[in-house]
Amino acid sequence: TARHPVYHLTKKSIELYHNGLMAMVWERTHFSSPSLDKVELIHNHCGRAFWPVMQCGSCDQQIRPEDIAFNPGPGAGKDQRATKTRRRSSTDAQSSSKTLYNNLINLLGDRWTANLVALAFHGLKRFDEFNQELPVATNILADRLKRLVNEGVLSQQPYQRSPLRYEYQLTDKGRDLFPYFVTLLSWGNKYCGTDAGDPMELIHNLCGRPLQAQVRCDQCFEVLVATEVHFNL
C-alpha cells in the first residue's frame, strides 16, 4: 500500500508565525468571521487567554506607523520587474467563514495591491508617485487604487480640481495592516535577502533605535513562540 506523504513545517515556515498572528488580529478587528472569532489563544507560558500585540524590543512601546522612519538600506533599489500591461480583474474582499484569513488573502494576494499599501506607509499619496515607483500599467494602477478605496483601506481626497486629481491616505483599517507588513518585511529580510543587505532600515522614532518589532502576549508581555501557544476552538 502506498504511503501518503507527511508534511511538516520547516524553520523557514515556522518563522512566519508572527505574521500569521498579525493577520489574525487584522481579520478579527475588521471582519466578522465565525470560524475565527471563536478561536481562543492560550499562552502556555502564563496560562492565560491572550491577544497578540506588537511592541518595540528596545523601548517596549506599541509600534505605530506614524512613529516609524523608513531609511534606504544597503540593498535598496528600484523595482526592476517588467511592466505588466495585461489587466487582471480583481474581486472585492468579502467576509467568509470558510478560511481563517480569506479577507486578507483576497485583498493583498494581488502583488500590486500589496505594493500600494506598503508604499502608502512610506508616505506616497498621489497616483504619479505610485506610478513612478511601480512598473505597473496605469489602468491596473487605477483599478487597484479604486479597490483599496472601496474596501476602506485608503481614503480619497481631491488635491486639484482642474483636472480632478486625488490623494490617497491610509484609513484606520489600512493603518492596522502595519504590523502584518512589518513581520513580513522581517521574514523577507531573513529569507529572501541578497548579499547587498536589507533594502530598508526602520527606525523607531520614540527611542531612536533600529526597530526590533516583537509580537508579544498582552497578558505577560513575553515574546510569543509557536510551540508555547495552543488554540481552543
Regions found by a protein language model. Name each.
Residues 96:
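Conserved phosphate-binding loops in nucleotide/dinucleotide-binding enzymes
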Residues 23, 184:
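Globin-like tetrapyrrole-binding proteins
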Residues 145-146:
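Short, hydrophobic-biased segments on the C-terminal half of alpha helices
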Residues 99-140:
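N-terminal helix-turn-helix DNA-binding core of bacterial DNA-binding proteins
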Residues 28-93, 193-233:
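C-terminal regulatory/oligomerization modules of transcriptional regulators
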Residues 1, 149-159:
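A short, conserved structural fragment
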Residues 1-20, 162-181:
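Basic, amphipathic "hinge/linker" alpha-helix immediately C-terminal to the N-terminal HTH DNA-binding motif
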